[in-house]
Amino acid sequence: MTKIGLFYGTQTGNTETIAELIQKEMGGDSVVDMMDISQADVDDFRQYSCLIIGCPTWNVGELQSDWEGFYDQLDEIDFNGKKVAYFGAGDQVGYADNFQDAMGILEEKISGLGGKTVGFWPTAGYDFDESKAVKNGKFVGLALDEDNQPELTELRVKTWVSEIKPILQS
């Protein structure tokens, strides 16, 4: 079985908690290696053919600071042939004009470098105005809102993982 690399950035701890839940649902640390992007380097990405990328949207539609610091280094990674799933944490009420933008920014960059995006997620059940993470009517990955819909996180993660697990493990 192919081991999966899960790279996340976190400011308040929410994205790390979600990453741990995803790792558990995927089958634990024997299936998924978790790495805080603040501790990662480009070589860490190179050892995986399947990736899960997690980033909260920070401030007004910006990348979380550790992802912002790593962003230019993404250019040094060959994503061709890599399957990449995304998840993000955001606030759809307080930041309705840029809900999940960070997830969209990372997906656009990585897909532009050859990554194959998997794990699109429906926009139904959310109330926002705009998002850079929406393509063809769906989020480019799992959109979570710990501020306004924390009670939906566990079910959303379980549902999403059940969809991406067979794709990432094939």
Curated annotation (Swiss-Prot):
Q: Which UniProt keywords apply?
A: Electron transport, Flavoprotein, FMN, Transport
Q: Which residues form the Flavodoxin-like domain?
A: 4-165
List the cysteine pairs that form cystine. Answer: none
Which cofactors must be present for this protein to function?
Answer: FMN
**Molecular function (Gene Ontology), one example:** electron transfer activity
- Report which superkingdom the organism of origin falls in: Bacteria
What does this chain do?
Low-potential electron donor to a number of redox enzymes.
Q: State the similarity comment.
A: Belongs to the flavodoxin family.
Task: Give the protein name, as stated in the record.
Answer: Flavodoxin
Report the source organism: Synechocystis sp. (strain ATCC 27184 / PCC 6803 / Kazusa)
